[in-house]
Amino acid sequence: FYRFIPNEYGKLHKGGQLQAMMVKGKPQFDSRNWNNKAMVLHQELEVEWVNLDNPESPKDDLRLRGYKQGAALFARGEGIHWGDKELYFCCTNGGKKQLGQVMKYQPSEFEGTDKEAQQPGKISLFVESTSKTLYNFGDNLTVSPNGHLIVCEDQYTDVVDNHLRGVT
């Protein structure tokens, strides 16, 4: 998961710093839960950010370089939506059964500033599917007017049976 800190707010053309998320005190944290349950539902983990050089990545190795520097692993990150002071994103094939996860990020009050370490942002596992009937390969997502998360499935199977799933 990445963020960009501009050199000058509102003027992206003036450059800045691309950063990757790292779980505080747990470098190279594996949120996928494929082999072991490192990420527990609703457990908030404080984050730090790793600076990434050469973000154009002509060798297509940005994620690998970030991981070597301690960035967390997420399973096929896709859809993203800003809710009410929180951000949600899909990890399409995350989870023990590899049916999908939704992560929730709560930014620091001091996000992107020198004071951020005093009150870091927090990442948590919001949803992890244990059954295809619950949730299967979430891709895009949004937050409805009543605050519930709506996730669009995106399976690649012989019989395509995708749904919109509501998460409360």
Please name every model-derived segment.
Residues F1-T168:
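Sequence/structural signature of beta-propeller domains
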